[in-house]
Swiss-Prot record:
Gene Ontology molecular function, alphabetical: ATP binding; phosphoserine-tRNA(Cys) ligase activity; tRNA binding
Source species: Methanococcus aeolicus (strain ATCC BAA-1280 / DSM 17508 / OCM 812 / Nankai-3)
Catalytic activity entry: tRNA(Cys) + O-phospho-L-serine + ATP = O-phospho-L-seryl-tRNA(Cys) + AMP + diphosphate
Family the entry assigns: Belongs to the class-II aminoacyl-tRNA synthetase family. O-phosphoseryl-tRNA(Cys) synthetase subfamily.
SUPFAM superfamilies: Class II aaRS and biotin synthetases (SSF55681)
Enzyme class: ligase
Keyword Nucleotide-binding appears in the UniProt entry: yes
Protein name: O-phosphoserine--tRNA(Cys) ligase
Binding positions (substrate): H188, M189, T190, S233, A234, S235, Y275, Y276, N319
Function, in words: Catalyzes the attachment of O-phosphoserine (Sep) to tRNA(Cys).
GO biological process, one term: translation
EC number(s) recorded for this UniProt protein: 6.1.1.27
């Protein structure tokens, strides 16, 4: 915080001077808190959920009402809808199963086993309570997840002892096997529409325009890049006396044009499902101008009067359905549905920006005075980098360290004749391009021709870190000085000859980024001569 009264006093005396000098009140960010080593934090949605919401809004804009269809479908409904081909269809359905309730009595042998656990059943009341609990469970009155608690409660025991009784006295529970039920998980939205429409007939005036977007489950032989065992169906129905196949074409165009598709083709579907009227099952192909190709995106048809009659539905019903995942793959440019739906099971790809964010300065001083000294040292290096050797330049500064004042003198030197004070790579900058990390020089004059194109692309198209070699090395120097202050060391020397790795320029990279670079055979190439020689003296 700064003193506002003092600032205003200075401004009243000399505004221009105050305007310039008060810039020092706004502190610069620490080196590892400067952009691009900071980035905005925000949540991320899944493409499937995005597409579901887009489809919901698209249907609503077209005047459809949203309904939730039953997920659990009795197998008899599959027979009603598919007729003779029901058995083949049921092969792709998941059946539900449940554990039977064992008929467990409380015999004298069971009571003896309980008492061997150190539990006294010394009254008829306790026996009756336990017997009643087991009976209620058998009849389905008592839920399975309450059984341990109720066993313990009937005998006045802790939950732990109730569980022990269940495990050691009633092994029947361990041997239970699930028994199949005549109930299936919905394999396609049509199974739910027949049930829904049947219930709505006579309750709501015709016509109906309904849609539902929800999960379906299909027992695929295996999952691959285009098939999952659970997927989302975006399905709609038009129900009314004058419904025709042309309504399906219009709905398909109206819906899909909201997702960037332009031209449409309607082709007879060779599958010919029995719940559709013959010659009405139609595949929708749509042209996507960005992808420049025709894509199969939906199917529609008119439900068979035979199937409708089994549900007392006496008017035509047009049904259109499409796979949400299919549309999401098109819109988000995915080739494998598994990677889109379940990204957590696959390697995450870091962008160049992400990698640039992951590169940090390793050693940084904590004291503000040393951070300021770092900036002054960088200026000294840049200003004198081309000074001819033998030569030396120095910077001297007093800083407060606990209750003492220390004088720090940093000297840059080069003793060998005919050289510059510093090597030609000190102003190289770090860029990330195509997953590679490069040290890019200011000028390409002395760069081998074979490297010019790569380095030029990195400079012009890559993600910058805004870090030069001299910046990061100077932070290492002042960090070493801070360590010397703490250990009461008076003198130290630091050399930075030829750079070969990130650590040579006081940089580190997050493990995930490094793993990606190595795993994808990318490179970290920041080679370059720095030839920096430093000696430091610390005096009271």
């Amino acid at each position: 915080m700064f003193d506002t009264k003092k600032v205003l006093e200075l401004a009243n005396k000399d505004f221009e001077k105050a305007w310039i000098t008060t810039k020092d009140l706004i502190k610069d960010a620490p080196i590892n808190k400067k952009y691009p080593r900071i980035k905005p934090s925000f949540g991320k949605t899944n493409p499937v959920m995005d597409t579901i919401e887009q489809l919901r809004q698209a249907y609503l804009r077209m005047g459809f009402e949203e309904y939730i269809n039953p997920v659990i479908v009795d197998e008899k409904d599959i027979y009603k809808q598919f007729g003779p081909e029901a058995m083949a269809v049921l092969d792709r359905c998941f059946y539900l199963a449940g554990l039977p309730r064992p008929d467990i009595g409380l015999s004298n042998d069971k009571i003896e086993q309980i008492e061997k656990l150190g539990i006294k059943i010394d009254s008829n009341e306790k026996k009756e309570n336990l017997r009643k609990t087991l009976h209620l469970y058998k009849k389905g009155v008592l839920e399975g997840d309450d059984l341990v608690y109720e066993i313990a409660n009937s005998l006045g025991l802790s939950n732990e002892m109730g569980l022990k009784i269940l495990e050691e006295v009633f092994p029947e529970f361990k041997n239970l096997k699930a028994e199949s039920l005549p109930l299936t998980l919905r394999s396609h939205m049509t199974s739910g529409w027949f049930i829904t429409i049947s219930e709505m007939m006579g309750k709501k005036p015709l016509p109906y325009a309904l849609f539902s977007i929800d999960r379906c489950f299909r027992r695929e032989q295996k999952e691959d890049k285009s098939h999952l065992m659970t997927y989302h169906s975006a399905s709609c129905v038009l129900v009314g006396e004058d419904i025709t196949l042309d309504d399906g074409k219009a709905i398909a165009e109206g819906l899909l044009s909201q997702f960037g598709f332009t031209d449409f083709q309607f082709r007879p579907d060779e599958k010919k499902s029995k719940y559709y009227t013959p010659e009405t099952q139609t595949e929708v192909y749509a042209y996507h101008p960005k992808l420049k190709e025709w894509l199969e995106v939906a199917t529609f048809g008119i439900y068979s009067p035979i199937a409708l009659s089994k549900y007392n539905i006496s008017v035509p019903v047009m049904n259109l359905g499409l796979g949400v995942e299919r549309l999401a793959m098109i819109n988000h440019n995915y080739e494998d549905v598994r990677k889109m739906v379940y990204p957590q099971f696959y390697e995450q790809t870091l962008s160049d920006r992400d990698i640039a964010y992951s590169i940090k300065v390793d050693k940084v001083p904590v004291l503000d005075e040393l951070k300021d000294l770092t900036g002054e040292l960088i200026e000294l290096c840049v200003k004198n980098k081309d000074k001819q050797s033998p030569c030396e330049v120095f910077i001297e500064k007093k800083i407060k360290f606990y209750n003492t004042t220390k004088t720090i003198k940093i000297t840059l030197f080069e003793k060998e004749e005919g050289k510059n004070l510093l090597g030609p790579s000190i102003l190289n900058k770090i860029f990330v391009h195509n997953g590679n990390i490069f040290g890019v020089p200011e000028s390409f004059d002395n760069v081998k021709e074979e490297f010019v194109k790569v380095l030029s692309e990195a400079k012009n198209k890559g993600a910058p870190t805004n870090l030069t070699y001299i910046d990061t090395i100077c932070y290492k120097i002042t960090s070493k000085i801070e360590e010397a202050l703490i250990s009461n060391t008076k003198k130290l020397k630091i050399r930075a000859p030829i750079v070969r790795s990130l650590s040579d320029v006081n940089l580190k990279i997050d493990e995930l980024a490094l793993k990606q670079i190595m795993g994808n055979n990318k490179v970290i190439d920041i080679r370059g001569p720095v030839f920096l020689n430093v000696k430091c003296e610390i005096n009271d």
